[in-house]
Swiss-Prot record:
Similarity-based family: Belongs to the WTF family.
Region Disordered, residue ranges: 1-39
Functional description taken from the UniProt entry: Promotes unequal transmission of alleles from the parental zygote to progeny spores by acting as poison/antidote system where the poison and antidote proteins are produced from the same locus; the poison component is trans-acting and targets all spores within an ascus whereas the antidote component is spore-specific, leading to poisoning of all progeny that do not inherit the allele.
Keywords, alphabetical: Cytoplasm, Endoplasmic reticulum, Membrane, Toxin, Transmembrane, Transmembrane helix, Vacuole
GO cellular component, one term: ascus epiplasm
Lineage summary: Eukaryota, Fungi, Dikarya, Ascomycota, Taphrinomycotina
Origin: domain of life: Eukaryota
TM spans (from-to): 89-109, 119-139, 149-169, 174-194, 204-224, 229-249, 265-285, 289-309, 319-339, 353-373
Record protein name field: Meiotic driver wtf18
Subunit structure: Homomer. Forms protein aggregates. The two isoforms can interact with each other and with themselves. High sequence similarity is required for their interaction.
Organism: Schizosaccharomyces pombe
Length: 410
């Protein structure tokens, strides 16, 4: 094939020429290379070949950088082989001792069992020699690995500290700006909130005062008109206070005799205060106080009679007896108070009522015995009638047969 006067070019030359034309559009085409005078630079293809040749030559040479520590260790190993071997053995033994004591601490709690002894002997007999041989034979490898790990760790920590310091500085700056804006916005917001809250509280105080005045008026009227509900409420309050007092007695913090006497007095004072607050009419307060004093008198009489009987018969009430007495007085007192408040004057009429009850009971017993006597008289009459019946039957048996036939015909 004829080249028609065109010089032969390689594919690399064409690619470099194409790239040169694409890159140097503003500067124009490069001058032709003249190998004779050498005044102009060679084309890019020859520069690329030269760079490639230099890189290939440099790649064939040694690329590993010599480490001073490795060189010093190699020189020490070559000059003092015995000391180096002894040092390797010492470090290996120290590592095995560390493993041995670690195994001893872990296995010591289980040493009394068979499993603990077997594990300990396996650790001593197999693991430690293998570990000693491995560390001694691969001393240089694992020391280099440890050194490399320490180096990488130190570099990583330094970078982490640097990044953290930069990050914290930026965070502090951003936080300071944010806090400044927050303080400004918060101050404005709090000023508005204080203003709105003051206006709202003023309105609330006004509305609350009016509402409480109406509530007090309604409650006073309602309590004045519903005396029965008030009596039930007072009675429930008395029950609660008595339970508290008897709980203190049960716990040992209060003497029972004092509790029996002081309970009514305390309740009277509390109810007096409550009734003064709700403005109950004076006759209701007077009635309640008389009822409480009457109940207190009944309780005191029961306590005195009980104590007198116990000392008269030379017997003392134990803890269980005190509880029974307290429960009885509690039930009697509440019943009498509630009955007095429901039916005014019931406690005053109680002696007469008790006398009438006793008289009625005795009259009932007399009537019962009279009825029993009448019953026995009726039984006697019935027996007499039965005797008369038997006597009449015997008289009929004495009549002759002829007379019986005549009577039958008639």
């Amino acid at each position: 094939m004829k080249n028609k006067g065109y010089p032969l070019r390689s594919s690399m030359d064409e690619l470099s020429t194409k790239n040169d034309n694409e890159i140097d559009l503003e500067k124009g085409p490069l001058p032709e290379y003249n190998s004779e005078d050498g005044s102009t630079l060679p084309p890019y293809s020859e520069i690329w070949k030269y760079i490639k040749t230099v890189s290939e030559d440099s790649s064939t040479g040694p690329t590993e950088t010599t480490n001073p520590n490795v060189e010093r260790r190699q020189e020490f190993k070559d000059s003092h082989p015995n000391i180096y071997s002894l040092l390797r053995l010492l470090i290996s033994v120290l590592a095995v001792i560390v493993v041995f004591f670690t195994a001893w601490v872990c296995v010591n709690p289980l040493e009394k069992s068979i499993f603990g002894k077997v594990a300990f002997f396996v650790t001593i007999g197999i693991t430690c020699p293998i570990l000693l041989i491995t560390i001694f034979c691969f001393f240089e490898t694992w020391t280099q690995a440890v050194a490399q790990c320490i180096k990488v760790t130190v570099i990583f920590l330094a970078q982490c500290v640097k990044v953290t310091a930069v990050f914290l500085a930026k965070c502090i700056k951003v936080t300071a700006v944010f806090l400044a804006k927050c303080v400004k916005v918060t101050a404005v917001f709090l000023a508005k909130c204080i203003k709105v809250t003051a206006v709202f509280l003023a309105k609330c105080v006004k509305v609350t005062a009016v509402f409480l005045a109406k509530c007090v008026k309604v409650i006073a009227v309602g309590l004045y008109n519903s005396k029965k509900d008030l009596v039930v409420t007072i009675w429930l309050a008395w029950v609660v206070i008595c339970f508290i007092l008897f709980g203190c007695v049960k716990d040992g913090r209060l003497n029972l005799n004092k509790a029996l006497i002081c309970s009514t007095c305390s309740i009277s004072a509390a109810l007096f205060f409550i009734l003064l607050l709700v403005c109950i009419p004076i006759w209701t307060l007077k009635h309640m106080l008389f009822g409480l004093f009457q109940v207190l008198g009944v309780q005191s009489c029961v306590v005195i009679v009980t104590k007198g009987l116990m000392y008269l018969f030379d017997k003392h009430i134990d803890a269980t007896g005190y509880e029974i007495e307290a429960s009885s007085l509690f039930v009697i007192g509440n019943f009498l108070f509630f009955y007095e408040m429901e039916r005014p004057g019931a406690l005053k009429r109680m002696p007469k009522f008790i006398g009438n009850g006793i008289a009625s009971f005795l009259g009932g017993l007399g009537n019962a015995f009279g009825g029993i006597g009448n019953a026995f008289g009726g039984i006697g009459n019935a027996i007499g009638r039965i005797g008369n019946a038997f006597r009449g039957a015997n008289d009929n048996n004495d009549i002759p047969l002829g007379e019986m036939d005549v009577e039958s015909e008639v």
